[in-house]
Amino acid sequence: MNGIGCASVGPPAGAAPGKPAGVTVGEILRTHACDYIASRGGKVPAYELRVMQELAACRTAALGGHVSECDHCGAREYFHHSCRNRHCPLCGGAVRARWLDRCREDLLPTLYYQTVFTLPQELRLLTLANPKVGYDLLFKATAETLQEVAATPKHLGAKIGVMLVLHTWGRSLQYHPHVHGVVPGGGLSPDGTRWIAARDKFFLPAKVLSRMFRGKFLAGLKTAWREGRLRLEGELASLADHETWEKWLSPLYRKNWNVFVEPPPCEVAPHPEAVFKYLARYVSGVAISNSRLEGLAEGRVTFHWKDYRQDGHEKFMTLSAVEFLRRFFQHLLPPGFVRIRHYGFLSMRQRTQALPLCRQLLKLAGVVTPELGDPLAVPALPQAAESPTCQARLCPVCGQGQLRVVANWRRPTLPELMTMRVWSTVSSCNAPRRTPPPERPPT
C-alpha cells in the first residue's frame, strides 16, 4: 500500500496555477503569531485571537479531515478541513463562486457602472478605532448620495439600484477604507412606467457626488460624536473636547473627497461575463492573497504589489513578519458585519418585484444589448471544486481506481480549537498538528 499525501499528487491548497507552492498567511501565523501578540503587549481582543487561530489551523490536521483511498492500487490522500473564516485567503474563492452564482439572475441587460467612494486620510485613524460606526456611516453616506443625485431630474431623474462592497486595504496592505459600487446604467422613472437610461458612458457627475458624500459623512460623524458613539482614546483623546473636535473637522469640509464613476474596464462589452469578472474582484476578498506572497525568511515577509501611480508597475515589499501581521489584522471586520449591501431596486425589500419590471421596461425601451440577449440565460459560473467527501474521484496515481473516503477525523469545536497550540513559540519551529486516525486496511 502506498501512503501518499495530497501534496504529492498536486499543488497544495493556496498555490497559484503554474506557480510553485509558496508561503501562506497561515504559515506566517503558525511561525510568528507569538511575536505579533508580544508586540501588542499580550493584549489581543478575543475575536482577533479566534481569527488568528482559525487561519493558522486552516487546512492542517488541527481542523480534522478525512482520508481517501484508491480501490485499485491503495494509494491514499489526506485532506484537511478549511476554516471557512471570511478573512482567510484560502477559503474566499469557493464563497465567491457560490455568491456570484446566486446573484447572476439579478443582472440586467444594460451597461453597468463602477463607483468608488474613499475616505480621506485624515479620517482613517478615527475609522480604524471605530470600525462599526465608520463603516456603517460610509455605506449610508455612499448609498444616499448615489440615490439622491440619480433622482435629481437634471442628472438622471430615476430610481436606481446599487450594490456596495466595503474594502479597507490598499495594494501594500495599508489602511485605506473605501466602498466599491456596481450600478446599472439607468433606473426606473418616478412613476415606475419606463426605464430611464444614462447617457452614453456617463452616469452621474463625480464632483456633485463628492460634495454630497462629504457633507453626509461629516454630518453623520458629528451625530455619532454628539451621541457618544465614538471611542476617542490614545491619539484621539483630544477630540473629546468640543472645540478641538470642531477645529479638527473644519478642514475636511474644504477638502476634495475622492469619488470615481466609470463604466467597467471592458466598456464595449457589457455582457454578463464582463460584469461577473468585475464583481468577482470585490466579493469575499481579503487584504492579500497567498499568490502575492513571495517568501518568508529570517522573520521577514516579501510580497508583490502593483503601483497604480506608476501605470500598475509591479513592485516588491519586504516587512517584518510582525509588521505584516499588524497590517493584515487591521482589516478585520467587526463580528457579524455585512460588507456587501444592496440599495434601491436591488435591495432585498424591492428586488423581487422591481427586477422583473426593470427587464420588461428595458425590453420595451429597446436597450437590450445583443451581447447580453436573454437576461435570464446567463452562462453558469465555474463552480468551486466539490469536496472529495461528496463523490469518488479517479486516482491520480494509477489512473484506474476510484478514490473513496475510508476514514474521518472530526472538526474540533470552537472551544476545543481555542485550546490548541496551532502556532509555535519559536519562529523556527513547525506548528504542531493533531494526530490523524490510524490507517485502516482497505475493504
Question: Whereabouts are the PLM-identified features?
Answer:
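Beta->alpha loop/short-helix hinge microenvironment recognizer with preference
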Residues: 1-443
